[in-house]
From Swiss-Prot:
Subcellular location: Cytoplasm
Function statement: During stationary phase, converts 70S ribosomes to an inactive dimeric form (100S ribosomes).
GN (gene name): rmf
InterPro entries in the cross-refs: Ribosome_modulation_factor, RMF_sf
Disulfide bridge partners, by residue number: none
NCBIfam families per the UniProt record, alphabetical: PRK14563.1 (NF011162), Rmf_CrpP_fam (NF041886)
Transmembrane annotation, as ranges: none
Protein name, UniProt field: Ribosome modulation factor
One Gene Ontology cellular component annotation held by this UniProt entry: cytoplasm
Presence of keyword Cytoplasm: yes
Keywords: Cytoplasm, Translation regulation
Principal cellular location given in the protein's record: cytoplasm
Domain of life where this protein originates: Bacteria
Length: 58
């Protein structure tokens, strides 16, 4: 049975979240498409918030 790839926007959010938790700058967003970039930045913000509140460590 084939596994389906996640939706592109979900993947952009997840990558942004990983970047935020990892402490990367939001200027390092790899997306130029507005929708994907917005999702990446949303994930990045949540990742940074989680890192700041102590939910995640590097």
């Amino acid at each position: 049975m084939k596994r389906q790839k996640r939706d592109r926007l979900d993947r952009a959010f997840a990558k942004g979240f990983q970047a935020g938790v990892g402490g990367r700058s939001k200027e390092m967003c790899p997306y130029s498409n507005l929708d994907s970039r917005s999702q990446w930045l949303g994930g990045w913000r949540e990742g940074v918030d989680g890192r700041i509140t102590g939910l995640f460590t590097k």
